């Protein structure tokens, strides 16, 4: 399923390009149990520093290790991002320079308005990918801002791609656990 970018006349909006099967979603969630994928503190970028700020971002995260047993996931993400980029964005992209990150938002977890494009490693992010992995939670909506807040009706396994400069947030999870996978396709800096 490919949905054209939503809500922008320039075509650089949010798009759903695919849906992965539930067994793949479960396999990705289970990656947090493997010690090769380290749990890391979730940080927020402020100017040129990264800090822990639970008022802005409250989530647990696991970095998916750059090891052969995880190559299938990297290949899948790169293929999907290339598809979205060729169809809609037409950015100069090179690949996945940063490792994908598995996120768990428990009750009261959230991430306030932000963009994925920043300084340091984040300065070359072009296409952001978000894949919700489950539906057993309340709240936690993925919202985008473009001349007003837009909530997407998305389900587990939907592959959401958007330019990394688009502001977005995850609203507060009211109950349950919200699992998602995020990744960023990089390229030369925007001009």
List the predicted regions and their residue ranges.
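Fe(II)/2-oxoglutarate oxygenase catalytic core
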Residues: 1-159, 165-191
